Protein backbone atom coordinates (compact mmCIF):
# COMPACT_ATOMS: atom_id res chain seq x y z
CA UNK A 1 0.00 0.00 0.00
CA UNK A 2 2.84 2.40 0.78
CA UNK A 3 5.05 3.77 -1.94
CA UNK A 4 7.05 6.75 -3.16
CA UNK A 5 5.41 9.83 -4.58
CA UNK A 6 6.89 10.67 -7.98
CA UNK A 7 5.29 14.10 -7.90
CA UNK A 8 6.44 15.20 -4.45
CA UNK A 9 9.19 17.41 -5.88
CA UNK A 10 6.66 19.24 -8.05
CA UNK A 11 4.32 19.78 -5.10
CA UNK A 12 7.02 21.04 -2.75
CA UNK A 13 8.44 23.30 -5.43
CA UNK A 14 4.97 24.71 -6.07
CA UNK A 15 4.55 25.49 -2.38
CA UNK A 16 7.81 27.44 -2.40
CA UNK A 17 6.73 29.36 -5.49
CA UNK A 18 3.32 30.19 -4.00
CA UNK A 19 4.97 31.60 -0.90
CA UNK A 20 7.60 33.45 -2.90
CA UNK A 21 5.05 35.25 -5.04
CA UNK A 22 2.77 36.12 -2.16
CA UNK A 23 -0.23 34.59 -3.92
CA UNK A 24 -1.42 32.68 -0.88
CA UNK A 25 -3.81 35.33 0.42
CA UNK A 26 -5.37 36.02 -2.97
CA UNK A 27 -5.79 32.30 -3.60
CA UNK A 28 -7.57 31.56 -0.34
CA UNK A 29 -9.70 34.71 -0.40
CA UNK A 30 -11.11 33.55 -3.73
CA UNK A 31 -11.60 30.01 -2.47
CA UNK A 32 -13.37 31.24 0.66
CA UNK A 33 -15.69 33.40 -1.44
CA UNK A 34 -16.59 30.70 -3.96
CA UNK A 35 -16.96 28.01 -1.28
CA UNK A 36 -19.32 30.24 0.71
CA UNK A 37 -21.34 31.09 -2.38
CA UNK A 38 -21.79 27.42 -3.28
CA UNK A 39 -22.36 25.90 0.14
CA UNK A 40 -23.22 28.70 2.54
CA UNK A 41 -21.22 30.64 5.10
CA UNK A 42 -21.20 28.09 7.94
CA UNK A 43 -18.00 25.99 7.86
CA UNK A 44 -19.61 23.39 10.13
CA UNK A 45 -22.06 22.47 7.36
CA UNK A 46 -19.83 23.36 4.39
CA UNK A 47 -16.77 21.06 4.19
CA UNK A 48 -15.22 22.98 1.30
CA UNK A 49 -15.43 26.21 3.28
CA UNK A 50 -13.99 24.48 6.36
CA UNK A 51 -10.97 23.35 4.32
CA UNK A 52 -10.46 26.84 2.87
CA UNK A 53 -10.82 28.37 6.34
CA UNK A 54 -8.17 26.03 7.74
CA UNK A 55 -5.83 26.92 4.86
CA UNK A 56 -6.39 30.64 5.31
CA UNK A 57 -5.76 30.47 9.06
CA UNK A 58 -2.66 28.38 8.38
CA UNK A 59 -1.41 31.18 6.12
CA UNK A 60 -1.87 33.63 9.02
CA UNK A 61 -4.75 35.45 7.36
CA UNK A 62 -6.68 37.67 9.77
CA UNK A 63 -10.22 36.79 10.77
CA UNK A 64 -11.38 40.13 9.44
CA UNK A 65 -10.16 39.34 5.93
CA UNK A 66 -11.61 35.82 6.16
CA UNK A 67 -14.99 37.09 7.32
CA UNK A 68 -15.16 39.67 4.51
CA UNK A 69 -14.34 37.01 1.90
CA UNK A 70 -17.09 34.73 3.23
CA UNK A 71 -19.53 37.66 3.35
CA UNK A 72 -18.89 38.39 -0.32
CA UNK A 73 -19.67 34.78 -1.13
CA UNK A 74 -22.95 34.75 0.74
CA UNK A 75 -23.99 38.12 -0.65
CA UNK A 76 -23.85 39.85 2.72
CA UNK A 77 -21.15 42.22 1.43
CA UNK A 78 -22.41 42.80 -2.10
CA UNK A 79 -22.48 40.56 -5.14
CA UNK A 80 -19.52 38.55 -6.35
CA UNK A 81 -19.04 37.42 -9.94
CA UNK A 82 -15.96 35.21 -9.63
CA UNK A 83 -16.36 31.90 -11.49
CA UNK A 84 -14.33 28.69 -11.52
CA UNK A 85 -12.77 27.56 -14.80
CA UNK A 86 -10.47 24.68 -15.75
CA UNK A 87 -8.23 24.77 -18.81
CA UNK A 88 -6.55 21.71 -20.30
CA UNK A 89 -3.66 21.30 -22.67
CA UNK A 90 -0.34 19.74 -23.52
CA UNK A 91 3.00 21.23 -22.60
CA UNK A 92 6.44 20.45 -24.02
CA UNK A 93 7.33 16.77 -24.40
CA UNK A 94 3.65 15.81 -24.45
CA UNK A 95 3.13 16.55 -20.75
CA UNK A 96 -0.56 16.86 -19.85
CA UNK A 97 -1.43 20.03 -17.94
CA UNK A 98 -4.58 21.12 -16.10
CA UNK A 99 -5.03 24.72 -14.95
CA UNK A 100 -7.65 25.60 -12.32
CA UNK A 101 -8.65 29.27 -12.30
CA UNK A 102 -10.98 31.66 -10.52
CA UNK A 103 -11.78 34.80 -12.47
CA UNK A 104 -14.22 37.64 -13.00
CA UNK A 105 -13.25 37.91 -16.68
CA UNK A 106 -13.29 34.72 -18.75
CA UNK A 107 -11.83 36.32 -21.87
CA UNK A 108 -8.86 37.79 -20.02
CA UNK A 109 -8.06 34.50 -18.32
CA UNK A 110 -8.44 32.38 -21.46
CA UNK A 111 -6.14 34.70 -23.42
CA UNK A 112 -3.49 34.68 -20.69
CA UNK A 113 -3.53 30.89 -20.32
CA UNK A 114 -3.44 30.38 -24.09
CA UNK A 115 -0.48 32.75 -24.38
CA UNK A 116 1.47 30.84 -21.73
CA UNK A 117 0.95 27.51 -23.50
CA UNK A 118 1.90 28.99 -26.87
CA UNK A 119 4.98 30.83 -25.60
CA UNK A 120 6.34 27.72 -23.88
CA UNK A 121 5.87 25.30 -26.77
CA UNK A 122 2.57 23.81 -25.67
CA UNK A 123 -1.00 23.82 -26.91
CA UNK A 124 -4.19 24.75 -25.09
CA UNK A 125 -6.74 22.00 -25.69
CA UNK A 126 -10.49 21.62 -25.47
CA UNK A 127 -12.50 20.45 -22.47
CA UNK A 128 -11.74 16.79 -21.82
CA UNK A 129 -8.55 16.72 -23.84
CA UNK A 130 -6.40 15.69 -20.85
CA UNK A 131 -8.88 15.42 -17.96
CA UNK A 132 -9.16 11.67 -18.51
CA UNK A 133 -5.49 11.38 -17.52
CA UNK A 134 -6.20 12.68 -14.00
CA UNK A 135 -8.26 11.66 -10.99
CA UNK A 136 -9.59 14.06 -8.37
CA UNK A 137 -8.33 12.82 -5.01
CA UNK A 138 -7.98 13.89 -1.42
CA UNK A 139 -4.41 14.23 -0.14
CA UNK A 140 -3.74 14.41 3.60
CA UNK A 141 -0.10 15.01 4.55
CA UNK A 142 1.55 14.18 7.86
CA UNK A 143 4.95 15.53 8.89
CA UNK A 144 8.06 13.46 9.51
CA UNK A 145 7.98 11.57 12.80
CA UNK A 146 4.42 10.29 12.68
CA UNK A 147 3.98 6.60 13.54
CA UNK A 148 3.71 5.19 10.03
CA UNK A 149 2.34 1.77 11.02
CA UNK A 150 -0.34 3.25 13.26
CA UNK A 151 -1.24 5.85 10.64
CA UNK A 152 -1.50 3.21 7.93
CA UNK A 153 -3.76 1.06 10.11
CA UNK A 154 -6.01 4.03 10.91
CA UNK A 155 -6.09 5.07 7.25
CA UNK A 156 -7.11 1.59 6.13
CA UNK A 157 -9.87 1.47 8.74
CA UNK A 158 -11.10 4.84 7.44
CA UNK A 159 -11.21 3.48 3.85
CA UNK A 160 -8.33 5.56 2.49
CA UNK A 161 -7.13 4.66 -1.00
CA UNK A 162 -3.38 4.69 -0.42
CA UNK A 163 -0.61 5.64 1.99
CA UNK A 164 2.64 6.97 0.49
CA UNK A 165 5.98 7.54 2.24
CA UNK A 166 8.00 10.44 0.83
CA UNK A 167 11.77 10.85 0.79
CA UNK A 168 11.59 13.79 3.20
CA UNK A 169 9.98 11.57 5.84
CA UNK A 170 6.47 12.92 5.41
CA UNK A 171 3.55 10.61 4.68
CA UNK A 172 0.63 11.24 2.32
CA UNK A 173 -2.74 9.57 2.76
CA UNK A 174 -4.77 9.56 -0.45
CA UNK A 175 -8.54 9.25 -0.52
CA UNK A 176 -11.35 9.29 -3.02
CA UNK A 177 -12.81 12.72 -3.68
CA UNK A 178 -16.08 11.75 -2.00
CA UNK A 179 -14.34 10.17 0.99
CA UNK A 180 -11.85 12.96 1.68
CA UNK A 181 -13.61 14.70 4.56
CA UNK A 182 -14.66 11.43 6.20
CA UNK A 183 -11.11 10.05 6.17
CA UNK A 184 -9.68 13.34 7.38
CA UNK A 185 -12.11 13.49 10.29
CA UNK A 186 -11.50 9.82 11.16
CA UNK A 187 -7.72 10.33 11.28
CA UNK A 188 -8.13 13.44 13.43
CA UNK A 189 -10.38 11.47 15.79
CA UNK A 190 -7.68 8.78 15.96
CA UNK A 191 -5.19 11.38 17.19
CA UNK A 192 -3.33 12.20 13.97
CA UNK A 193 -2.80 15.89 13.21
CA UNK A 194 -2.31 16.62 9.52
CA UNK A 195 0.30 19.10 8.32
CA UNK A 196 -1.77 19.73 5.20
CA UNK A 197 -4.97 18.52 3.55
CA UNK A 198 -6.27 19.35 0.10
CA UNK A 199 -8.17 18.19 -2.95
CA UNK A 200 -5.78 17.54 -5.86
CA UNK A 201 -5.74 16.19 -9.40
CA UNK A 202 -3.41 13.18 -9.54
CA UNK A 203 -2.20 11.84 -12.89
CA UNK A 204 -2.99 8.23 -13.73
CA UNK A 205 -0.02 8.04 -16.11
CA UNK A 206 3.26 9.95 -16.10
CA UNK A 207 5.66 11.42 -18.65
CA UNK A 208 9.26 11.04 -17.49
CA UNK A 209 11.45 14.00 -18.40
CA UNK A 210 15.15 14.55 -18.93
CA UNK A 211 16.83 17.79 -17.87
CA UNK A 212 15.95 19.73 -21.02
CA UNK A 213 12.34 18.56 -20.95
CA UNK A 214 12.00 19.34 -17.25
CA UNK A 215 13.29 22.87 -17.76
CA UNK A 216 10.76 23.50 -20.54
CA UNK A 217 7.82 22.10 -18.61
CA UNK A 218 8.70 23.96 -15.42
CA UNK A 219 8.97 27.18 -17.42
CA UNK A 220 5.37 26.65 -18.54
CA UNK A 221 4.20 25.81 -15.02
CA UNK A 222 5.97 28.89 -13.64
CA UNK A 223 4.37 31.12 -16.26
CA UNK A 224 0.92 29.71 -15.57
CA UNK A 225 1.30 29.99 -11.80
CA UNK A 226 2.36 33.62 -12.18
CA UNK A 227 -1.04 34.49 -13.68
CA UNK A 228 -3.27 36.28 -11.19
CA UNK A 229 -6.34 34.18 -11.99
CA UNK A 230 -4.64 30.78 -11.63
CA UNK A 231 -5.36 28.81 -8.46
CA UNK A 232 -3.65 25.46 -9.18
CA UNK A 233 -1.60 23.85 -11.94
CA UNK A 234 -1.38 20.07 -12.25
CA UNK A 235 0.68 18.01 -14.68
CA UNK A 236 1.70 14.42 -15.26
CA UNK A 237 5.38 15.35 -15.46
CA UNK A 238 7.65 12.84 -13.74
CA UNK A 239 10.99 14.44 -12.90
CA UNK A 240 13.47 11.85 -11.57
CA UNK A 241 15.43 12.84 -8.47
CA UNK A 242 18.67 12.90 -10.47
CA UNK A 243 17.16 15.49 -12.79
CA UNK A 244 15.50 17.46 -9.98
CA UNK A 245 18.87 17.84 -8.26
CA UNK A 246 20.30 19.43 -11.40
CA UNK A 247 17.42 21.90 -11.50
CA UNK A 248 18.39 23.23 -8.08
UniProtKB/Swiss-Prot annotation:
The keyword Repressor does not apply. It is found in: Cytoplasm. Belongs to the TACO1 family. Pfam families: TACO1_YebC_N, Transcrip_reg. This is Probable transcriptional regulatory protein PFL_4766. The keyword Disulfide bond does not apply. GO terms for cellular component: cytosol.
Amino acid sequence: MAGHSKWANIKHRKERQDAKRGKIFTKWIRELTVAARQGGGDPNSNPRLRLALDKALGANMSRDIIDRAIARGTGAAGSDDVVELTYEGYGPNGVAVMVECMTDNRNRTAAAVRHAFSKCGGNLGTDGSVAYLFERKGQITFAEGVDEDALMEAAMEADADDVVSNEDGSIDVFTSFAGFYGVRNALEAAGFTAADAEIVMLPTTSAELDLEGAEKVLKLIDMLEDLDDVQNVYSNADIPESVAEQLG
